[in-house]
């Protein structure tokens, strides 16, 4: 039986957002913006994640605290609220906030796939960087997890990739809080190496995980960056790699420094948006 879906909406950027049924996973929806798949949600089982990079982030969420323990989480970029739904399903009682620029997108998501009524999830509208600068004082030092997954269409905007931007995130983290960043990149991995250099400037421990061919710059894809606010060990990282999806490679310590190479931390004046994906990447 097909799912009744709302009509596509035009966002303030002029891009079109729409939901489609996933023909391979019954009861699931895919949110696309400007033809680029942005989010996948399983309406029947929100604790099941589909996209590879989302599964990697899901494993971070599973491992960085005791199983089932409620957390405080801030999501920069809403998409279809896939990860907030996952946290609500796997860590009930968690307190979560989402910052999303596009109010029309939020309305579309709420219509197509409403959040659980009792979920402790609040949505704030606005540009992530602007809203970060005026969050309540009570959120300072209180976030166990901050997820950065910000895209305008298929690119991460430049102003949410700089050291100044991450400088607004750092004070929000609890002493052992974690930041997780989703980045997309291709040949040379210049954007992602710059993100890693920027995070290393702000946080004591950073790890990068992705498919080996993507990390080598031979293929366009997602790379997940993990940064710790205070735990220099991150002793759960080996388990993160083992969780998959596979193949996967993790870069930490000396390997990460060598991979970053000459890439410098990104400043506002040098920031660039992430590269566009190849046109054929999402062809079916």
Briefly describe each language-model feature range:
Residues 1-23, 38-44, 63, 216-284:
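SAM/dcSAM-binding transferase cores
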Residues 24-26, 175:
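Short strand-connecting beta-turns/loops that link adjacent beta-strands
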Residues 29-33:
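Short polybasic amphipathic segments
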Residues 36-40, 151-154, 179, 186:
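A short, flexible beta-alpha/helix-coil linker loop
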Residues 44-171, 187-190, 196:
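The AdoMet/dcAdoMet-binding core of the Class I SAM-like
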Residues 93-95, 118-120, 176, 203-205, ...:
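A generic structural signal for alpha->beta connector loops
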Residues 164-234:
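C-terminal substrate-binding/active-site "lid" region of AdoMet-derived donor-dependent transferases
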């Amino acid at each position: 039986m097909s799912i009744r879906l709302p009509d596509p909406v035009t966002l303030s950027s002029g891009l079109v957002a729409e939901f489609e049924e996933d023909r391979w996973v019954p009861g699931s929806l895919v949110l696309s913006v400007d033809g680029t798949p942005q989010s996948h949600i399983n309406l029947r089982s929100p604790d099941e994640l589909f996209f590879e990079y989302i599964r990697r982030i899901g494993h971070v969420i599973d491992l960085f605290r005791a199983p089932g323990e409620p957390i405080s989480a801030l999501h920069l970029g809403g998409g279809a609220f896939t990860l907030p739904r996952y946290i609500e399903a796997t860590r009930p009682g968690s307190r979560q906030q989402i910052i999303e620029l596009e109010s029309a997108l939020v309305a579309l998501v709420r219509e197509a796939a409403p959040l659980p009524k009792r979920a402790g999830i609040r949505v704030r509208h606005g540009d992530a960087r602007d809203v970060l600068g005026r969050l309540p004082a009570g959120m300072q030092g209180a976030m166990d997890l901050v997820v950065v997954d910000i895209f305008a269409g298929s690119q991460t905007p430049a102003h949410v990739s700089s050291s100044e931007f991450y400088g607004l995130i750092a004070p929000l983290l609890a002493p052992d809080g974690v930041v997780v960043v989703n980045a997309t990149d291709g040949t040379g991995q210049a954007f992602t190496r710059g993100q890693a250099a920027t995070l290393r400037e702000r946080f004591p421990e950073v790890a990068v995980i992705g498919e080996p061919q993507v990390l080598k710059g031979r293929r366009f894809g997602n790379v997940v960056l993990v940064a710790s606010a205070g735990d220099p060990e991150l002793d759960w990282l080996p388990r993160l790699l083992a969780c998959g999806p596979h193949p996967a490679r993790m870069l930490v310590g000396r390997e990460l420094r060598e991979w970053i190479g000459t890439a410098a931390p990104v400043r506002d004046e040098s920031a660039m948006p992430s590269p566009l994906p190849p046109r054929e990447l999402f062809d079916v």
